[in-house]
Amino acid sequence: MIYTNDYESPLGNILLAGDKQGLTGLWFTEGSRYTGLGLKKDARRCETDYFDQTKEWLGIYFSGRNPGFFPRLHLVGSDFRNRVGEIMCEIPFGKTVTYGWIADQIAKERGLKKMSAQAVGGAVGHNPICIIVPCHRVVGSNGNLTGYGGGILRKKALLELEGNDMNQFKIPTKIGRAHV
C-alpha cells in the first residue's frame, strides 16, 4: 500500500509518499517533472509517523535551520541509485559537492579508477525524495546549477536558504518551463 500526504512549503505545495517502511517520495507538485512518478492510483491519503517526522523536518528546514535528523526513509531504486542517495544524505547543510566528487567516492568504494559523473547525474536526477535527500546540494564541476526536478529557481532558493554564497554558482540564462 502506498500512502500520501501534503505539505505547504514557502516554495509551493509538496506531495509526500510512503509505504509501510518509510518515506519513499517528496516532490513539489507544481513545475516538477517527476511529481508522483510511479504512484499507484490506489494510493491512500493518510497520516503516518514518518509523515509527521517529515513535516517536522520540513518546518525546521524552511525556518533556515539544519533539522539535525532524518525522518524514516525508504530508498527505493537500484543499488547504485540508493548509494548515490546515501552519499547525498551525507552532504552537510549549507555545503555543496559536484557530480564528479560523488563519482569519485563511488569509484573508491568499488575499487575503480574512475566512475562516470554523468551516471551519477542520472541517479541524482531521479532522486524521488527531494530536499531531504539533498540533490539540490549537487552542482556541476564549473559551478553550474544544473537540473533539479523542482526547477532551477527552487534549487537556487534552497541553496540560499542554507546560507550558500550564490556568487560561486552559475545560473543558466535560459530557463525552460521545466526549470522554473
Spell out what each predicted region is:
Residues 3-10, 56, 65-177:
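Nucleic acid-binding interface residues in structured DNA/RNA-binding domains
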Residues 1-24:
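DNA-contacting interfaces and partner/effector-binding or oligomerization modules
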Residues 20-70:
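Compact structured core domains
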Residues 15-16, 25, 98, 147:
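A sequence-level detector of short linear motifs
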